[in-house]
């Protein structure tokens, strides 16, 4: 499936000094987001920083959401991840996409201007209306069993 979404450059370095966000390969599910920085930024272990990407999008369709996710290589090799697990870009948000990076590694890491820091993918959304009830209309075998209640193997 392919859709067109309007994108706006909000940092003049994007597209000149810093490559435009794009899919790395034909089979990539997500667009790489790059750090729009004036200079290298050192992250110490345990530190979090909000990093601008220079990009804004107009998803427009409430049936789509932008999802900002960690890059596996940065997480595995350096302990850098999107701080809140994922970032959600709502269809009506038009501001610059920022990435909150958390550093879980043991050594300082320096982010360079233009470095790929996260990935942006687009997913369908189903909005629901919650019907508040005192008891559910159906029961399940699991019931209210929480973590670990579905088995170990």
UniProtKB/Swiss-Prot annotation:
- Is Magnesium among the key words of this record? yes
**What Gene3D superfamilies has UniProt attached to this entry?**
2.70.40.10
Q: Sorted alphabetically, which keywords does the UniProt record give?
A: Hydrolase, Magnesium, Metal-binding, Nucleotide metabolism
Pfam families tied to this protein: dUTPase
Q: Name one GO biological process term.
A: dUMP biosynthetic process
Q: Which reaction does it catalyse?
A: dUTP + H2O = dUMP + diphosphate + H(+)
Task: Write out the GO MF terms.
Answer: dUTP diphosphatase activity; magnesium ion binding
| Names of the cofactor(s) | Mg(2+)
From the UniProt record, list the coiled-coil ranges.
Answer: none
Q: Which sites bind substrate?
A: 71-73, 84, 88-90
Q: Which InterPro entries match?
A: dUTPase (IPR008181), dUTPase-like (IPR029054), dUTPase-like_sf (IPR036157), dUTPase_trimeric (IPR033704)
* Enzyme Commission number(s) of this protein: 3.6.1.23
Pathway-wise, it operates in: Pyrimidine metabolism; dUMP biosynthesis; dUMP from dCTP (dUTP route): step 2/2
Name of the top EC class for this enzyme: hydrolase
Name the PANTHER family for this protein: DEOXYURIDINE 5'-TRIPHOSPHATE NUCLEOTIDOHYDROLASE (PTHR11241:SF0)
Q: Which NCBIfam families match?
A: dut, PRK00601.1
Q: What does this protein do?
A: This enzyme is involved in nucleotide metabolism: it produces dUMP, the immediate precursor of thymidine nucleotides and it decreases the intracellular concentration of dUTP so that uracil cannot be incorporated into DNA.
**Homology family:** Belongs to the dUTPase family.
Q: What is this protein called?
A: Deoxyuridine 5'-triphosphate nucleotidohydrolase
Provide the species name: Halorhodospira halophila (strain DSM 244 / SL1) (Ectothiorhodospira halophila (strain DSM 244 / SL1))
